[in-house]
Structure formats: C-alpha cells, structure tokens
C-alpha cells in the first residue's frame, strides 16, 4: 500500500519512530521515500527534534498538541507534496526548470540533477533548494528560509533549517566539490551564487 504522508510517534511498540523514518527514507519495502513525515511526540528535547529532522522528518509536533494545528500542518505538507509530485495529477506540467552551478532543478517533476546524477530530495529539501536557486546571489537568513518554506512565523530559534541544509549538502556531495553549490554567509544565512 502506498501512503501520501506518515505521522510517527518516537515511542512506538516494537520499533521506534526514528527507525521507521530511517526505513522509509531508505526505501524499505517499496515505501514512498519522498512522502512527508511528521513526528508527533511527547519528547520535547531539542536533541530528539534535531535527530528527527536529520533522519528525514519534514515536521515535528510535540504533545500535547492542538488538533487544529496538527491538521493545518498535515494539510500544508500534503499541499507541498502534491505540488511537487508529478504523479499526483494536482497540477499541469509547465516547463519550470532552473539550471545553475552544474545543477538542474525541475519543479514540475521534482527532479534535481547535480553533475549529471539525479538526487532524491524530500519536499522540504526541494523547496529550500528551489528557493535559493530561484534567487541566485540573494542571501536568506535561516528565519527567512523557515518562513518561506514552512509558511509559518519563527517564534523561537531552532536548528531546523541548518539540519535540512546539512542534509541537502550531503545528498549533493558538497564535501567533494570544489565549487560549493550552497554557500554559507557566516552570521547572515545561505545563498547560491550566480
């Protein structure tokens, strides 16, 4: 069975939510590796949140939670996912492609090609990369990235954006490239040069 979204608790019987997230992102049992993953957990420590995002979560909601807020977050993730998933039938295909720094990003089919190799990104990772690439040379602070990608105000400082940028860099093999795609402007934010 194919799912569009997973809501996981960290403390589940038999297998914890972190392991389920790891297996989904790893393609276990034919799972939809790109589907949004939302953690819903009583664990409120920053370590648990960062670990969840590092493993591939797109959102993390702590208990107790407001059911209306959770519903809004799920709808937001599904909306982003259906916009980026070419098989959803939710939008018409229009040539919406950016080519920059040896990388091609196609918004219509959610494909990213770096140095001739396709890389798989979660919807959040894709949105961050697309935001930076569609504004070459512009520096975005972590708060600006969070507000534009998650469509929410930042109420407290967190490492969410930095964790996603780190995962993006890992998938694009930034550590082996001489010309980095995503540049850190220390104390300011991130950008992709023209």
Segments (PLM) and residue ranges:
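Conserved functional loop/turn residues at catalytic and ligand-binding sites
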Residues: 2, 54-56, 64, 69, ...
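His-Asp phosphorelay/catalytic-motif detector in bacterial-type signaling
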Residues: 2-4, 28-36, 154-155
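Active-site beta3 strand of CheY-like receiver
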Residues: 2-7, 12
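Active-site phosphate/pyrophosphate-handling residues
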Residues: 16-19, 48-51, 75, 127, ...
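Basic, amphipathic DNA-recognition helix from helix-turn-helix-like DNA-binding domains
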Residues: 18, 22-26, 34-99
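Short boundary/linker motifs that mark transitions into or out of structured domains
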Residues: 96-111, 188
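Positively charged, aromatic-enriched patches within helix-turn-helix-type DNA-binding elements
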Residues: 111-181, 185-188
């Amino acid at each position: 069975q194919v799912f569009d979204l997973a809501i996981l608790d960290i403390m589940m019987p038999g297998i914890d939510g972190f392991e389920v997230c790891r297996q989904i992102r790893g393609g276990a049992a034919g799972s939809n590796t790109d589907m949004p993953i939302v953690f819903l957990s009583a664990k409120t420590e920053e370590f648990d949140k960062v670990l969840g995002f590092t493993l591939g979560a797109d959102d993390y909601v702590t208990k107790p939670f407001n059911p209306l807020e959770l519903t809004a977050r799920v709808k937001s993730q599904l909306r982003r996912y259906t916009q980026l998933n070419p098989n959803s039938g939710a939008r018409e295909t229009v040539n919406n492609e950016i080519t920059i720094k040896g990388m091609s990003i196609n918004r219509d089919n959610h494909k990213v090609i770096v140095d001739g190799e396709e890389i798989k990104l979660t919807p959040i990772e894709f949105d961050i990369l697309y935001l930076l690439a569609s504004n070459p040379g512009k520096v975005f602070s972590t708060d600006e990235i969070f507000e534009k990608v998650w469509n929410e105000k930042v109420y407290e400082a967190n490492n969410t954006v930095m964790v996603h940028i780190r995962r993006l860099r890992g998938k694009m093999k930034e550590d082996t490239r001489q010309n980095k795609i995503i540049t850190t402007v220390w104390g300011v934010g991130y950008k992709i040069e023209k």
